[in-house]
Amino acid sequence: MALQNEKNSRYLLRDWKPENPAFWENKGKHIARRNLWISVSCLLLAFCVWMLFSAVTVNLNKIGFNFTTDQLFLLTALPSVSGALLRVPYSFMVPIFGGRRWTVFSTAILIIPCVWLGIAVQNPNTPFGIFIVIALLCGFAGANFASSMGNISFFFPKAKQGSALGINGGLGNLGVSVMQLVAPLVIFVPVFAFLGVNGVPQADGSVMSLANAAWIWVPLLAIATIAAWSGMNDIASSRASIADQLPVLQRLHLWLLSLLYLATFGSFIGFSAGFAMLAKTQFPDVNILRLAFFGPFIGAIARSVGGAISDKFGGVRVTLINFIFMAIFSALLFLTLPGTGSGNFIAFYAVFMGLFLTAGLGSGSTFQMIAVIFRQITIYRVKMKGGSDEQAHKEAVTETAAALGFISAIGAVGGFFIPQAFGMSLNMTGSPVGAMKVFLIFYIVCVLLTWLVYGRRKFSQK
């Protein structure tokens, strides 16, 4: 049901003016913060579901399955494929259905892949094709990011959007590390024994109940759905059809900024999905699941910081410096990998933590760039055509939200390509070096792109 059918709802905000200082201080900021924190909770759980397979795949063969390394890397990558594709339509949904309604729907449906995965892992005869379908369904969780970020952008004034988007995206991204921290612990606890879940004995005498890794999120998703229904709002002025939002695809800056976001958020989500499997192949004697959560945790916290410092120092400056460090860490990684020797796990882990840190910081700074740049170019374009300030502001809000959602879809593609690149490189050469060379070159290209287009001079308002 579209927003126009919600005219009499107490959840519909008919007069929303966050740029008005008096309105913001007296009323707006309290409503915006409530919507932000509920959004953070829903998005955090969505990221938990999106990255489920990054923790599940490393344990599948321990409970009776016999999948190849390529198959396991594929399962970790597939949620990012569907998540990236679904982010495109998801980015247009909030102005059509409303942020509250869409958050309720998009959170509730995540219960389906969680329940199904918990059932599937209990039968070692479950076909690989079933896991492919479940992995693709987990991608719906990744799509939530596009609608969530677009929705929150409507609630905050431009001066606070970097911080607000950083908090929403950063703490939402924290779901990756929460899942990778909780899953390895909960699978050894008989949480759902009352449902007849029988664990599989392990060589060390423990009993693994892998279904717990999926089912533990079901009650939390139900609670978050109820919270979104009862505590969030829809904004009447944010209403726009798909036709109103599609012109954003014609903007050159949409595609340039998509590349930058692919390098930052794409790296964060790709490394989150593939790091545990990569570390397991390079350092098989290390129990990586006890350490894997820390990288996504650093990246998620860094995203919030990246948005905040970009509001203060400028997103372009922060992004440029960040890409330089991403390139440096990528180059250092070559020195830590096993070659003729056994490699150095401590150095490998430390350098990867640096990559997670910079990927997180860059995710926050590039999103701040997107919000600022699209607001500027839209206002400039509307006024050049003789439009009023009110019209310019309205179109700027709509185009910025659409751009944030669409660019987030491009960024999510990294969650597929990075694990697949690692898997392909390992399959062809027995080493991930080939994949890392590609990443290093890409980061260098992004340094040049950021500097030449946005850093040296005032960019073209097109």
UniProtKB/Swiss-Prot annotation:
GO molecular function: nitrate transmembrane transporter activity; nitrite efflux transmembrane transporter activity
Outcome of substituting residue 113 to A: No change in activity
Alphabetized CDD domains for the sequence: MFS_NRT2_like (cd17341)
Periplasmic side: 57-76, 123-125, 202-206, 280-287, 339-344, 423-432
Membrane topology of the entry: Multi-pass membrane protein
Segments on the Cytoplasmic face: 1-35, 98-101, 147-180, 228-258, 309-317, 366-401, 454-462
GO biological process annotation, one example: nitrate assimilation
Consequence when changing residue 175 to A/S: Loss of activity
Effect annotated for changing residue 261 to N: No change in activity
One term under GO cellular component: plasma membrane
Effect of residue 405 to A/L/V: Loss of activity
Annotated consequence of substituting residue 307 to L: Loss of activity
Transmembrane domains' residue ranges: 36-56, 77-97, 102-122, 126-146, 181-201, 207-227, 259-279, 288-308, 318-338, 345-365, 402-422, 433-453
Signal peptide: none
Keywords: Cell inner membrane, Cell membrane, Membrane, Nitrate assimilation, Transmembrane, Transmembrane helix, Transport
Domain of life: Bacteria
Induction field: Expressed preferentially during the stationary phase in the absence of nitrate.
Key word Cell inner membrane present: yes
Annotated consequence of substituting residue 99 to A: No change in activity
Subcellular compartments: Cell inner membrane
Stated family: Belongs to the major facilitator superfamily. Nitrate/nitrite porter (TC 2.A.1.8) family.
Summary of the function given for this chain in its UniProt record: Catalyzes nitrate uptake, nitrite uptake and nitrite export across the cytoplasmic membrane. May function as a nitrate/H(+) and nitrite/H(+) channel. Could confer a selective advantage during severe nutrient starvation or slow growth.
NCBIfam families: 2A0108, PRK15034.1
Protein name: Nitrate/nitrite transporter NarU
Gene of this entry: narU
